[in-house]
Amino acid sequence: MSVRGHAVRRRRASTRSHAPSAHRADSPVEDEPEGGGVGLMGYLRAVFNVDDDSEVEAAGEMASEEPPPRRRREARGHPGSRRASEARAAAPPRRASFPRPRSVTARSQSVRGRRDSAITRAPRGGYLGPMDPRDVLGRVGGSRVVPSPLFLDELNYEEDDYPAAVAHDDGPGARPSATVEILAGRVSGPELQAAFPLDRLTPRVAAWDESVRSALALGHPAGFYPCPDSAFGLSRVGVMHFASPADPKVFFRQTLQQGEALAWYVTGDAILDLTDRRAKTSPSRAMGFLVDAIVRVAINGWVCGTRLHTEGRGSELDDRAAELRRQFASLTALRPVGAAAVPLLSAGGAAPPHPGPDAAVFRSSLGSLLYWPGVRALLGRDCRVAARYAGRMTYIATGALLARFNPGAVKCVLPREAAFAGRVLDVLAVLAEQTVQWLSVVVGARLHPHSAHPAFADVEQEALFRALPLGSPGVVAAEHEALGDTAARRLLATSGLNAVLGAAVYALHTALATVTLKYALACGDARRRRDDAAAARAVLATGLILQRLLGLADTVVACVALAAFDGGSTAPEVGTYTPLRYACVLRATQPLYARTTPAKFWADVRAAAEHVDLRPASSAPRAPVSGTADPAFLLEDLAAFPPAPLNSESVLGPRVRVVDIMAQFRKLLMGDEETAALRAHVSGRRATGLGGPPRP
């Protein structure tokens, strides 16, 4: 009987219902059975409607080669009293609101009143799922939102927005109204414009002014350069030395500068080359793309969340796959709003990416749209600084990774660096997942202004987003679980790369906390009038930051895969649910971000290296170019991060070695081009390398 026939027979059978523990050491994520509709592939088929039998066959083939998993006891850190006392509220200053038309304001205030009263009379199924924000706030006992001191310095230094509107540089007709093709015929133009008033989003500062400000980095010493606005020639050409310094807490300055040059060519320079020099598109079109992409991401977030939490779909799986679905569903942040409350999101299936050429450009280059000064200039003060800071720190992190990881010098990667990269991936996956949930709820609220669903009131609660980053206890728990235990603190203190990666995670934490709080403030309350333009800017800034977060996450995936599969390192470990969580995020965010597989990433890096004439070597530079750069200032910035969690429950699951889950990691996070390299490792033959064959 065919695989499809077996799947039909299984759909007719019923599964046993258990109450599983979400953190069993023998999680079915680790055990990949053979066959078509069982285990991981059966689960993915149910959640994503995967109907390609070739995926199932590949999964069975890879599962037969996979070594038995190693079971590890989960290590839990205990927050100290000092860290808890340091978790204090530090929120961006409030800005003045734009007055709204009187009729629209009155309608919004009445809708807000209905939402507030709905919290007590509606069944709880809000932004945080079954958790009531009032109960969460009662357990917080103090703010867990601890902004980066470097970010606060930059925010305090930032001047106010220009008092008068700034003219667009795009020429006549440069302020298009919001258009979302996937909602065509279901939402009128005025309704969509009320939800996303692009015609009111004039530049808050001049693009040239924002370009100059992006080159300033308060508190950053020489060697850790801020993100520029064009390619620069600070790095030496020729050999790029990847040997680790005698003190792993520092970088060779020359190699770091070369890594920063490579990072700029694969991120900011690539997007600016496509937008400014080739496509000749405009920041206003980029904002139109963001609105369309964010609505599609919201639809996909709702679809994925619904499939994760629909009990009826368990009948299509065997017991093992149904167990996996239940375990992950109990931990995921994707909590869909009821279909009746969001008919515009729930009317169809998953939303594909926009097919236009401009959209393809905006999705490319590792999510680097926020490196465009003209786009950042359209954001308000706090959101603009948040996007700029996230872009700067993720750029520095990308440069630092490319100064330590390269297919031509795999053996130079230190175990401590590979181990910490896995922990960073854990946190990035949780941050991305929670951001997708936030966008799904917020877009649902803006497209359905008369709905009284409690989730819509949750995302407008200032107190919730002042107390927790993204208003989520799960984000705080994941950050502390991955970066707050004794092992993680030791890894941070003994590696310069780890300090830079930790600072990048902290920057994304700070930026997302800032823009989501800004949205809650813009929604108004009894003391403040609603500001739809400011709220729309906060949503767009969140989309920009999420796109760059995904680009950094793909970079980390490429480095983890390189160390584990090409270098044979056993150091990289991830949470049990991290590959599955990140795969769900990548599915949902396809309209916003074109993912980069490890093979594609290293091919782009190799092309950039050839462009600037760099050749990797496993040696160390000699005097007089053997000077070092110390990122110790970032360790000082990280003193209060991560904040203490609300409880000791695991969000990530038991840690597993990446080499022990080869098949799952490849199927979920890597392209088909890596299959040959993985099979070579399993069979004991010499691997050909994830980035293509090595140079002779």
UniProtKB/Swiss-Prot annotation:
InterPro entries: Herpes_UL47. Keywords: Host cytoplasm, Host nucleus, Late protein, RNA-binding, Transcription, Transcription regulation, Virion, Virion tegument. Phosphorylated by US3. This phosphorylation is required for proper nuclear localization. Residues 57-84 are annotated as: RNA-binding. GO terms for cellular component: host cell cytoplasm; host cell nucleus; viral tegument. The keyword Transcription regulation applies. A motif (Nuclear localization signal) lies at residues 70-84. This is Tegument protein UL47. It comes from Human herpesvirus 2 (strain HG52) (HHV-2). The lineage of its organism: Viruses, Duplodnaviria, Heunggongvirae, Peploviricota, Herviviricetes.
